[in-house]
Amino acid sequence: MLFAAVVFSSGFRAQAQDPPPGGFKNALLTLGKSGKVALTYTLWDQQVGKGTYTLAFFWASWSDEAREELPYIQAIQKKYAGKVKVLGVTYGDEIQDSMDAMVELGMTFPHFVFVEDAEPDGRFDIDSIPLTILFGPDGKIIARDMKGEEIEKAVEEALR
């Protein structure tokens, strides 16, 4: 089940509302420069495999290891802007906790929110987080299970 929340900002704490009719399927959360979290609706396949490389970072607010990996992901976002799209995927987390962490950690890349250990179509074989997957312009997986500096090495190799 793909799930996210309608979000508004109150100070620095993002707040979720009740789901709109039809639920939160295909919702994408983005932290703006103002510190507010915005909601749009899009399909996973509209974000991945559209002629650009995509780095998907599966994480949860409670994962210390995911927080340790975040600087590597943010460095890719900054260094390869326009060449590599970075998507966060909160996984197995409470929605409010995910939104709070996005604000706290300054995660400005868009996020899909998966709850109840659901994943899109079961296609990624997620057995632990954090998990980083690099997709090619065709949407096929190029590399996965990268950590730390391995992430940038995989991106550099793919862009050659």
Model-identified regions with their sequence ranges:
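Solvent-exposed loop/turn segments at secondary-structure junctions
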Residues: A60-D64, Y91-Q96, D117-E119, K140, ...
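Conserved redox-active cysteine motifs that mediate thiol-disulfide chemistry
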Residues: F58-K78
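Thiol-based oxidoreductase modules, predominantly thioredoxin-like and allied folds used
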Residues: G82-D97, M107-D117
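N-terminal targeting signals for export/organelle localization
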Residues: M1-K36, A143
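Thiol/disulfide oxidoreductase modules built on the thioredoxin-like
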Residues: V103-T108, F114-A158
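A short beta-strand-turn-helix
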Residues: N26-T54
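Short pre-active-site segment immediately N-terminal to redox-active cysteine/selenocysteine motifs
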Residues: G51-T54, F58-W62, S128
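Hydrophobic beta-strand anchors of alpha/beta hydrolase catalytic cores
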Residues: L55-A56, V86, T132
